[in-house]
Amino acid sequence: MIIAYRNGDGMKQDPSGMYLYGATEWVDLDGAIDYAIKNGAKKVVLFGISGGGGPEASWIMNTNEPEKVDGFIYEAPTFNFIESVKVNGQARFPWLPVSLFDYFIWLSEIRFGIDFDSMDYREAVINDDTPMLLFHGDVDEWIQVSLSDYIAE
């Protein structure tokens, strides 16, 4: 089953109007898991690519029923959205000083009420004992392999 998250094309809008990299989208994932189980799924393995790793990791952090999922597969996942913003910003605007991205993050927190700290899922993933397959190439321009290395260690 492939699901879409709130704020996606044709999907329900989050009250914020923004895709929050799992902070709210994990609820959509939980609904999809329940749907699969109610319709006969014997095992549930979640697969998240890039930003799709956020909702999975947020689900780990927020669920009261971790036993519903039998495994996770991640490909170049975003487990820390602040780092993703900085890396993507530097890739798209290499002439800007790196410190300016901290200002943009701070401004987004104030202007849009985004809680970037709530989108740091690294410890939740590290402390979860569900089987996980994590792979990530070292030429990824958007998600640094060091973020996956941190999880793997």
Residue ranges of each PLM-predicted region?
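Conserved alpha/beta-hydrolase
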Residues: 1-13
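Short beta-strand immediately N-terminal to the catalytic nucleophile in serine-hydrolase-like folds
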Residues: 43-48, 75, 135
